[in-house]
A protein has these predicted regions:
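Residues within the alpha-helical elements of helix-turn-helix
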Residues: 45
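Hydrophobic alpha-helical connector segments
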Residues: 76-120, 137-146
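Hydrophobic alpha-helical bundle segments that form small-molecule/ligand-binding pockets
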Residues: 122-177, 202, 221-224
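Amphipathic alpha-helical segments used for helix-helix packing
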Residues: 68, 96-125, 155-163, 192-195
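Short hydrophobic/aromatic patch on the recognition helix
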Residues: 48-57
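Basic, helix-initiating cap at the start of DNA-binding domains
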Residues: 1-41, 58-65
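Alpha-helical structural segments
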Residues: 20-27, 62-77, 90-94, 121-125
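N-terminal intrinsically disordered/low-complexity leader segments
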Residues: 1-16, 184, 188-199, 229-230
Length: 230
């Protein structure tokens, strides 16, 4: 029986339910990452004994599942997308925005499928946009391909943000600090392609990089979904 199927127990003396437990866990994770979340710490935040929480969840892994499903409600589109491209674009962009609000989400993306009610609703909204467009295997590969892109991009962006927080150096501060070393290495002539990228390339922000890459991936998927001539 999953955590969503198991009935909740009556709450006493401090009011408790899964909604309160999940909200407290998300608050802890937002403040200090997943390492800040434990049944004991959540119980302390709620001024309740840890054993009471085990009446609602059986493990920290179940708690993580509930946290992810709560955030899936933020990812769920407000209205049904008009077509497959919009559906995948909305999924990618809303997942990125959720991860920017909840950095810990990046650590839980890409594993087993989300089985909570909100996660299933997100999957349904995405897949239904392909209705009648292609066979189910093609649709699944399309969704997997775009998901692989945006999950990887989100994790990379999250890693950069964590590095900034840990070191106190922005991206440009870090580049300036390492500039002399990079300049001396490129001056050896051993890295001509890298030198061209460093000196001639255009530096873009994370949002632009994400959006551009997403459009390129969607363009590639479109070639596989194109209907053959009648």
């Amino acid at each position: 029986m999953t955590v969503w199927d198991r009935p909740e127990t009556p709450s006493r003396p401090v009011p408790l339910d899964r909604e309160r437990i999940v909200a407290a866990a998300i608050a802890l994770a937002d403040e200090g990452g997943l390492e800040a979340v434990s049944v004991r710490k959540v119980a302390a935040r709620l001024d309740a004994g840890p054993m009471r929480l085990y009446r609602y969840i059986s493990s920290k892994e179940e708690l993580f599942d509930l946290m992810v499903d709560e955030v899936q409600a933020e990812i769920l589109p407000e209205e049904q997308p008009g077509d497959w491209r919009e559906a995948l674009g909305v999924l990618a962009q809303r997942t990125r925005q959720a991860a920017l609000r909840h950095a810990w989400l990046a650590d839980l993306l890409g594993g087993r499928p989300a089985m909570g009610p909100n996660g299933l609703a997100v999957a349904e909204a995405t897949l239904s946009a392909f209705d009648g467009l292609a066979d189910v295997d093609t649709v699944m590969r399309a969704v997997e391909t775009v998901s692989a892109y945006f999950i990887g991009a989100i994790r990379r962006e999250t890693a950069h943000l964590r590095a900034e927080h840990a070191t106190g150096l922005s991206k440009h501060d870090w580049q300036r600090a390492h500039g002399p070393h990079m300049t001396s290495m490129l001056a050896t002539g051993r890295f001509p392609a890298l030198a061209k990228a460093v000196y001639d390339g255009t530096d873009v922000d994370a949002e632009t990089s994400f959006a551009t890459g997403l459009e390129w991936v969607l363009d590639g998927v479109a070639t596989k979904l194109a209907r053959p001539p009648a």
